[in-house]
Amino acid sequence: MRQKRIAGMTLVELLCALAVVLLVSAGMVLGVSLAVRSYERSVAGSEAQVLCSTLETIVSDELRYAGTLKYDEGGKVVGFFSQNHPDADNQQSEFTTDDEGRVLLGGQKLLPNNAYPHGLRASVELKGYDKETRIFTAVITVTDRGGDTLAQTELQVKQLNKPADTPQG
């Protein structure tokens, strides 16, 4: 009788072992990529909350000490005099957003570029102003590259300085 060879593997056994190793490796690569994507999403969400909170502090300080107000044709406040971020002609400043999603006041950045990690974008919108109580209402929105909202807050700030109103325009 013939005895089986004990040493070594046959070609079929080698191919089966290689297929198992490849399947396990592919599963690990997929798992790691999903974990990295989930981690990046989580970090971006946390950074969005930090950015929103930081902008909330800066915007509330600016609105609290706002001077002369600027109204549009509909009577809505669109700008104000800011001592910290005056417009180029020292008139009323407005909250705007540049092409990269950085918040500007009077054409000047409120925060440095590295305050917007992971491609975060932000905007500030003045929703209203109550002349009797001198309370501003503003909305701060932080989005990702794709425009999905990651953080948003609405704040109400009482203006300390009694403003001298300016005409529309």
Model-derived features: positions:
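Aliphatic-rich helix starts adjacent to a transmembrane/signal segment
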Residues: 2, 6-61
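Short beta-strand edge segments in extracellular beta-sheet folds
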Residues: 156-160
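Extracellular and select intracellular beta-sandwich modules with Ser/Thr-enriched
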Residues: 151-153
